[in-house]
Amino acid sequence: MSGKKRTASSSRWMQEHFDDHYVKLSQKRGLRSRAAFKIEEIQEKDKLIRPGMTVVDLGAAPGGWSQIAVKLAGDKGKVIACDILPMDPIVGVDFLQGDFREEKVLDALLTRVGDAKVDVVLSDMAPNMSGTGGVDQPRAMYLVELALDMCHQVLAPNGSFAVKVFQGEGFDEYMKAVKEAFKTVKTRKPDSSRPRSREVYLVATGYKL
């Protein structure tokens, strides 16, 4: 991509961002990102998080999903968040900064979870996009596979999983793997997800493995 095209694309994104209804609404409500509305919409439809639940939030920074999750889980609940990027503290959220792909970070995350199983695993993880589909899609699929592996390690029976997946190579195989692990799997495209984005959210309930 030429510098000129990249600049035009970046300018378009910035214009969309500042004109975006959800960006303005997130600022008005004190939410850290427009992504918070995605998990809110999923919660409204699927009721994943209830008071007292333990939630793991992968790819948490800047904290939009964690803000919603900790509010829903309440004082008796627990939210454990992880991201390679730093995140300002959120009351009630136990945040671990590190690369989830690294064994030592995974071990540290599992230590924070402890012996008790968790009720919900959330993943809004995405790789740094290069703009090359043949590079970006495998990276994105690797992250969602790691998120599903996390479910296998920590999720309680009948637990739930919400994960961002980019449609493309590997999507159908991944959907099959999620369906094998959960009783019900739904595909959601929240209103707050940009229409031209290939992202969808798989919402899986009734963990059975």
Curated annotation (Swiss-Prot):
As for subcellular location, the record says: Cytoplasm
Q: Write out the GO cellular component annotations.
A: cytoplasm
The organism sits in which domain of life? Bacteria
Checking Pfam families in the record gives:
FtsJ
Q: Which reaction does it catalyse?
A: uridine(2552) in 23S rRNA + S-adenosyl-L-methionine = 2'-O-methyluridine(2552) in 23S rRNA + S-adenosyl-L-homocysteine + H(+)
Q: Which GO terms label this protein's molecular function in UniProt? A: rRNA (uridine-2'-O-)-methyltransferase activity
Disulfide bridge partners, by residue number = none
For this protein, the record's InterPro entries field holds: RNA_methyltr_RlmE, RNA_MeTrfase_FtsJ_dom, rRNA-MeTfrase_E, SAM-dependent_MTases_sf
Where S-adenosyl-L-methionine binds, per the record, is at G63, W65, D83, D99, D124
Parts forming coiled coils: none
Concerning CDD domains, the annotation shows: AdoMet_MTases
The active site lies at K164 (proton acceptor)
| Keyword Oxidoreductase on entry | no
Alphabetized UniProt keyword annotations: Cytoplasm, Methyltransferase, rRNA processing, S-adenosyl-L-methionine, Transferase
What EC number(s) would the UniProt record show? 2.1.1.166
Transferase as UniProt keyword: yes
Q: What does this protein do?
A: Specifically methylates the uridine in position 2552 of 23S rRNA at the 2'-O position of the ribose in the fully assembled 50S ribosomal subunit.
PANTHER family (UniProt xref): RIBOSOMAL RNA METHYLTRANSFERASE (PTHR10920), RRNA METHYLTRANSFERASE 2, MITOCHONDRIAL (PTHR10920:SF18)
* Family of the protein in this entry: Belongs to the class I-like SAM-binding methyltransferase superfamily. RNA methyltransferase RlmE family.
Q: Mind telling me what this protein is named?
A: Ribosomal RNA large subunit methyltransferase E
Organism source for this protein? Answer: Shewanella pealeana (strain ATCC 700345 / ANG-SQ1)
